[in-house]
Swiss-Prot record:
Name assigned to this protein: Protein nucleotidyltransferase YdiU
Highest taxon above the source species: Bacteria
Naturally occurring in which organism (per UniProt): Klebsiella pneumoniae (strain 342)
Keywords: ATP-binding, Magnesium, Manganese, Metal-binding, Nucleotide-binding, Nucleotidyltransferase, Transferase
Reactions catalysed: L-seryl-[protein] + ATP = 3-O-(5'-adenylyl)-L-seryl-[protein] + diphosphate; L-threonyl-[protein] + ATP = 3-O-(5'-adenylyl)-L-threonyl-[protein] + diphosphate; L-tyrosyl-[protein] + ATP = O-(5'-adenylyl)-L-tyrosyl-[protein] + diphosphate; L-histidyl-[protein] + UTP = N(tele)-(5'-uridylyl)-L-histidyl-[protein] + diphosphate
């Protein structure tokens, strides 16, 4: 099968990029490929053959139709305007066109210096590359909108961070890499016509149904608000903390993008900060919904030359409803509730209060709850609590609520076990795979990827146990 690549970004947005080629690594070699995604995209097995070396995965070759470029954008970082940013180490190799009309960017991360590298070296290390590959595929398996990881190479190139680490590259695939920061860039350069040009591009390629609408820009922005709200609501329900929700890390399609110092909750700790560089806790777990709105407000400001302030504010006012609707539905699913009743929020808040007091594991709590039976006062979750009387009191109210549903246990458990994962990507699991990979053993990386692809199946191995003490003390930063 021949892969088809287009150059829409290059052809339609000439002021939004710089052309350049990737800079290969020393002795680069393929260490992982995403076989299911490769099959979905029609990527021939021959491209992964060892005799072809690192090839396109290591920036050593281009496929027909590829025309590499680095995109320029700006953004707000930790609440402050950061000015011009851009693809500092990533290169958009091409836009794959599928037969069904869908299009996917192939973006090579760690591909070397670009005009937007600023003080960086344009490289990515094996540690951060593995973390992104694991997180993007874990989130996909959980049903959360995300960029994808297609392939990964390591090398003998030394990269200097807190320590010397091997250089690596990741082929990231997404329907689009357009960020809020793309719009901010030209707004703050006082070039509103280019902001509108980008909006036209995004609508033309990703919202074609809106092209002929008189108020297409407003309808598009309203959908961006909704998508952003729904994605962040999904993060909150699985206990995912992004860590660096700068506006340049916000996808216009509502994808989860730029996996850096992320983390999944172990103990239920609403003020959890996964990024040890986030001294003020701006991007703590509980702050993510508010930050999402703040970022949308920055995007709205960039669109103000061609959408009225009144219309933008009305669209922003829809954010909270969209987020709470999505969050409420998913949390009812997690509790096994098929209908909505007035006291449901109190029921959930009661469980959360217990979990905070007892430092309960977020993922294990909901998974064990999904095995409860409404006719039994016993629950496999009970043994997780020290204060059994407090749990029994809450569980009695929960069972009473389940009886109102008039849904049998099998149907309810099926729904609950389809939204309450048994397995999430805990930092200690990623760290174990990283350490073994750095020692040359990719076995754990493959095993962990395979496990994360099936998160809703009960397991008996250590992938689903609470983290060891050392795993809870892991610190993750923006260093990558």
């Amino acid at each position: 099968m021949t892969l088809s690549f287009t150059t829409h970004w290059r052809d339609e947005l000439p002021d939004f990029y710089t052309s350049l080629l990737p800079t290969p690594l020393d002795n680069a070699r393929l260490i992982w490929r995403n076989a299911p995604l490769a099959q979905q995209l029609g990527v021939p097995d021959a491209l992964f053959a060892p005799e072809n070396g690192a090839g396109v995965w290591g920036g050593e070759a281009l496929l027909p139709g590829m025309s590499p470029l680095a995109q320029v954008y700006s953004g707000h970082q930790f609440g402050a305007w950061a000015g011009q940013l851009g693809d500092g180490r990533g290169i958009l190799l091409g836009e794959q066109q599928l037969a069904d009309g869908r299009r996917y960017d192939w973006h090579l991360k760690g591909a070397g210096l670009t005009p937007y590298s600023r003080m960086g070296d344009g490289r990515a290390v094996l540690r951060s590359t593995i973390r992104e590959s694991l997180a993007s595929e874990a989130m996909h398996a959980l049903g959360i909108p995300t960029t994808r990881a297609l392939a990964m190479v390591t090398s003998d190139t030394p990269i200097y961070r807190e320590r010397v680490e091997p250089g690596a590259m990741l082929m990231r695939v997404a329907e689009s890499h357009v960020r809020f920061g793309h719009f901010e860039h030209f707004y703050y350069r006082r070039e509103p016509q280019k902001v509108q040009q980008l909006a036209d591009y995004v609508i033309r390629h990703h919202w074609p149904q809106l092209q002929d609408e008189a108020d297409k820009y407003l309808l598009w922005f309203r959908d961006v608000v909704t998508r952003t709200a729904q994605t962040i609501a999904s993060w909150q329900t699985v206990g995912f903390a992004h860590g660096v929700m700068n506006t340049d890390n916000m996808s216009i399609l509502g994808l989860t993008i730029d996996y850096g110092p992320y983390g999944f909750l172990d103990d239920f700790q609403p003020d959890f900060i996964c990024n040890h560089s986030d001294y003020q806790g701006r991007y703590s777990f509980e702050n993510q919904p508010a930050v999402g709105l703040w970022n949308l407000q920055r995007l709205a400001q960039s669109l103000s030359p061609f959408i009225s302030a009144e219309a933008l504010n009305a669209a922003l006012d829809e954010y909270q409803h969209a987020l709470l609707t999505a969050y409420g539905q998913r949390m009812r699913d997690k509790l096994g509730l098929f209908s909505q009743q007035k006291g449901d929020n109190d029921l959930l808040d009661g469980l959360f209060a217990l979990m905070i007091r007892e430092k309960s594991d977020y993922t294990r709590t909901f998974r064990l709850l999904s095995h409860s039976e409404q006719l039994s006062a016993a629950s496999p979750l009970r043994d997780e609590f020290i204060d059994r009387a407090a749990f029994d009191s809450w569980f009695a109210g929960y069972r009473a609520r389940l009886r109102d549903e008039q849904v049998d246990d099998a149907q309810r458990q099926q729904r609950m076990q389809g939204v309450n994962p048994a397995l999430v990507l805990r930092n200690w699991l990623a760290q174990r795979a990283i350490e073994q990979a750095e020692a040359g053993d990719m076995g754990e990386l493959e095993r962990l990827h395979a496990a994360l692809a099936d998160p809703f199946t009960d397991r008996e191995d250590d992938y689903v146990r609470r983290p060891p003490d050392w795993g809870k003390r892991l610190e993750v930063s923006c260093s990558s």
